[in-house]
Amino acid sequence: MSNNKSNSSFQNTENNDSKNILNEEEIIIKYTDEIKNEETRSEAIEKLYKYRENENIAIYLWYSRGTIAALLQEILNIYQYLSSSKLSNEKANKVKFIISLFQSIALNPKTRKEFLESQLLVFLYPFLSCPYKMKSYEIIRVTALGVIAALVKTDDSEVINFLIRTEIIPVILKIMKKGTFEIIGQVASFIIQRIVNDINGLKYICEMRERLFAITYVLDVMLQNKNNNKNIKNILRIYLGLIENKEAKNILKWTLPES
């Protein structure tokens, strides 16, 4: 009798889990469809943000006709605020939600390649190079960096090649040097570390002394900043990656800080 009750309880739990998954999928489909309507778009984006870790959300977003175009239009609408200091927290949060959804697409193995090939990542670059350091701008900056960090974490050489081709590395170095919030410097240095640990990334950095000197200069500046204690591991890993290259190793003998 007790075994029957246990089996029944287990089956009920399993059925409830299946229903919850099904309901979540239905919710995602509903709000994905509502993104296409300007009147329901903002709320739909905010609702979908809560489900960004669902393993299928990338599929629904990417293959739903007109959805990515609508999200991209919202991104483009914010560009006008990049030349002024009038970006509200409300608008910044909306863009953060969209970029986070892009990250879900970028992380999914079934959509990552198409995401890179679409060049959508490039539309996030202006947020990285924006000069303003108010909280609303930094929210978007760190979220955009998060997409790149998530991509380089996959150990996909094509991601590194894409970053090299689109010449974003100097911008990331600048963020490392001048990041207003510690977390921004940490994310930026993590990206550089992963680039250096890639064969093509290391080759790109070391084939021109100007690039190598640019990185070592930024690393030196960061080491002198006492607020960068939490970033020491990433900095050391970048140095360790660089010395794998013979020429870089010789140059670092003269440029490494004494202590």
Give, region by region, the residue ranges found by the protein language model.
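Acidic, serine/threonine- and proline-rich low-complexity regulatory regions
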Residues: T180, D198-Y204, D220-N229
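C-terminal transmembrane module of eukaryotic multi-pass membrane proteins
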Residues: L219-S259
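Hydrophobic core/packing positions within alpha-helical solenoid repeats
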Residues: L48-Y49, V95, F102-Q103, I148, ...
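Alpha-helical membrane segments in multi-pass integral membrane proteins
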Residues: Q186-I191, E210-D220
